[in-house]
């Protein structure tokens, strides 16, 4: 299952806006933001869980968490799975924005189960499973309260078989 890890919170105020950053040397000290699966899957599973975990610590309860692409696809899943029992998280909504449907965060179910700590319940065709693999983006789309794309044109394109990347 998912291991306990240090989550640092860095904050900065700029032009009257408070920014928070998730810190973890193990996951975020590499030379590039994207590497290769399954390393990226583990890193972004950590990030998704960390985002939710820090909210009560910093005393910020958002109305909406806006997720972008597969890298944050587990935020709506984790919110549904392990955070809804906590009153703090009840009623928080999620929006999943798709920038590029080609990149979905796909890997075998066993590895993703080990990385995420999610139960068998989540690995079904109507949830994270797609063509017998686990799919972070699909999970985010299934569990998000709303789905958006970067444009109306892109929204129409990805509804077609060619651009639907097997999620049509």
Predicted regions and their residues:
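Catalytic cores of nucleotide-sugar-dependent glycosyltransferases that transfer UDP/GDP/TDP-activated
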Residues: 1-168
